[in-house]
Amino acid sequence: MKKLIAALLTILTLMLSSCGDVSDVSVLFTDSQRYSETELNNVAEAAKSFFAINYDDCTLFTIEYNDAHNEQVREDNLWEFRCSFEPKSLTDVLELSVTYYDNQDSDNTNSLITETYYMVTLDNGNWEVGDHGRT
């Protein structure tokens, strides 16, 4: 388990290099035994690719593997991404939720934005980001 956590922390540190100034990285495993190391690495790689393309300005990136969606967002950060990978079926679909404050509104107020993506396994075992919704 320690090797798995160390490996994922290394992957997350590398993936954050394209994510601007990163002030904190944390990984929480509450039910990681449900997934193999390969599955967790595949999800991390898919998330890395997705966030590198879509979220260049993040300052805090937290990735969690757990069963309970965590919607905590710290108001003192301009951008905070807290990503929860939640099993929606046995092993083939995970929900990735991103919650952040966006102060780019025309009236200069902070809006709490939640974007949801469904990550699905492909026939070759890789993960990709599927459907998307925003609230």
Regions found by a protein language model. Give the residues of each.
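Sec-dependent N-terminal signal peptides of Gram-positive bacterial secreted proteins and lipoproteins
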Residues: M1-V22
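Short, solvent-exposed secondary-structure capping/transition elements
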Residues: L4, D105-T109, N126-G130
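Intrinsically disordered/low-complexity terminal segments and short unstructured peptides
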Residues: L9-L12, V98, V120
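Flexible low-complexity loop/turn motifs enriched in small/helix-breaking residues
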Residues: S17-S111
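Short beta-strand edge/turn micro-motifs at domain boundaries
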Residues: T114-T135
